[in-house]
């Protein structure tokens, strides 16, 4: 009977290539494995290859250094009673190709009206000075070391407080008296009123070499350009992530009489997680075009890094995301650092920690930093203090 079953099983296996056995168990006292000669040869060859790899000589890596026919214009901000800062002047894209002549600059955002809608991690630093733009700017400079201040004239918006251009000029005068750093003067974003406001603000700050923000194709950019020419200011040329739009606007401003040394471009900053790759693409292409000789794009660039706070990950309270006290500044820092590595020269920011860290990082981009003597970090541990447990 058993032989019949075995014979039947063998017939079933005649045309079978493989057998899969489920829930198989084998109890043995001793197991011997025999390797086929081909398997032994494969093992020996593998060992030989590994020995050959380990024996390869080390090769020194030298980063590729390119030379470019063009360079970025240098823009000076701050004259008269102001300290001066310089933007641009680059002759290469990467720091290892050639360090920047001027470090990137961070400017503190200040507003002409209280901003209770700011995220708490920012508001808690400035809640005591929000009623007065002069005090707000003074605190940014004296307590947090701001090298520049951006005064946003939000209150002039028709749907906000509808402050007149003359009232805006008084706010500018107050901030000018409060601090001695260069100013960026921004409007409310209203295309009809902003040129009038910037014109009056430029007059109030005559000779102080401020940056008027901004001129774009949706408003009277000619009026903004004339205000800059008449009162010795520079102009922020704002385009929305479009290289061709940026070229067109720059060309129009140059036709109005501005020089490349009077223009700073803002290609628009999309926040981390909200389209930052578009900004990386446009900013890098813009800088490369400038270095390759496109004179319409040979100006420094600005980043509205404050846009990072519009990301819900920066301010929304959610326990699994971690505390906003850290998350918000980190979101702003990473957004700014990404723009810095892409070629941006000046950053508008909100949080004191973000401003400080990005400024410190920017200083490493300069020739002075790269040629300075650095300490031997291998000796960073000088003493150990421990207790046995």
Curated annotation (Swiss-Prot):
Judging by the UniProt lineage, the source's domain of life is Archaea
Q: Which InterPro entries match?
A: Ac-CoA_synth_d_su_TIM-brl, ACDS_complex_subunit, CO_DH/Ac-CoA_synth_dsu, Dihydropteroate_synth-like_sf
Q: Name one Pfam family in it.
A: CdhD
Q: Which GO terms describe its biological process?
A: one-carbon metabolic process
What the protein does? Part of a complex that catalyzes the reversible cleavage of acetyl-CoA, allowing autotrophic growth from CO(2). Probably maintains the overall quaternary structure of the ACDS complex.
SUBUNIT field: Heterodimer of delta and gamma chains. The ACDS complex is made up of alpha, epsilon, beta, gamma and delta chains with a probable stoichiometry of (alpha(2)epsilon(2))(4)-beta(8)-(gamma(1)delta(1))(8).
Q: Identify the PANTHER family for this entry.
A: ACETYL-COA DECARBONYLASE_SYNTHASE COMPLEX SUBUNIT DELTA, PTHR36214
Q: Member of which family?
A: Belongs to the CdhD family.
Name of the protein this chain belongs to: Acetyl-CoA decarbonylase/synthase complex subunit delta
Q: What's the source species for this entry? A: Methanothermobacter thermautotrophicus (strain ATCC 29096 / DSM 1053 / JCM 10044 / NBRC 100330 / Delta H) (Methanobacterium thermoautotrophicum)
Q: What is the lineage of its organism?
A: Archaea, Methanobacteriati, Methanobacteriota, Methanomada group, Methanobacteria
């Amino acid at each position: 009977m058993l032989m019949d079953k075995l014979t039947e099983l063998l017939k079933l296996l005649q045309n079978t290539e493989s057998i899969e056995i489920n829930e198989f168990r084998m109890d043995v006292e001793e197991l011997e494995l025999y390797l086929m000669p081909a398997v032994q040869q494969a093992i020996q060859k593998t060992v030989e290859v590994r020995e050959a790899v380990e024996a390869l000589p080390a090769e020194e890596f030298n980063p590729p250094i390119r030379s470019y026919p063009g360079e970025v214009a240098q823009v000076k901000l701050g004259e008269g009673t102001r300290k001066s800062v310089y933007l641009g002047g680059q002759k290469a894209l990467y720091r290892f190709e050639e360090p920047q002549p001027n470090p990137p600059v961070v400017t503190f955002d200040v507003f002409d009206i209280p901003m209770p809608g700011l995220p708490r991690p920012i508001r808690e630093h400035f809640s005591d000075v929000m009623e007065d733009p002069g005090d707000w700017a003074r605190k940014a400079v004296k307590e947090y070391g701001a090298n520049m201040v951006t005064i946003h004239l939000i209150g002039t918006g028709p749907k906000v407080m509808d402050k007149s251009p003359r009232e805006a000029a008084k706010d500018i005068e107050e901030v000018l008296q409060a601090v001695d750093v260069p100013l960026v003067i921004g409007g409310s974003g209203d295309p009809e009123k902003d040129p009038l406001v910037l014109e009056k603000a430029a007059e109030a700050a005559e000779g102080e070499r401020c940056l008027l923000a901004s001129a774009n194709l949706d408003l009277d950019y000619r009026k903004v350009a004339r205000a800059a020419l008449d009162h010795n200011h520079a102009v922020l040329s704002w385009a929305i992530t479009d290289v061709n739009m940026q070229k067109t606007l720059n060309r129009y401003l140059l036709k109005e009489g501005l020089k490349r040394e009077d223009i700073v471009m803002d290609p628009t900053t999309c926040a981390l997680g909200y389209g930052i790759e578009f900004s990386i693409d446009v900013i890098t292409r813009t800088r490369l075009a400038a270095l390759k000789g496109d004179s319409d794009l040979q100006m420094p660039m600005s980043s509205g890094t404050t846009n990072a706070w519009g990301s819900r990950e920066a301010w929304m309270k959610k326990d699994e995301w971690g505390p906003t006290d850290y998350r918000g500044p980190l979101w702003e820092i990473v957004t700014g650092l990404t723009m810095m590595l892409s070629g941006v020269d000046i950053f508008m920011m909100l949080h004191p920690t973000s401003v400080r860290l990005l400024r410190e990082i920017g200083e490493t981009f300069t020739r002075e930093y790269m040629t300075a003597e650095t300490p031997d970090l291998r000796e960073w541990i000088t003493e150990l203090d421990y207790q046995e447990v």
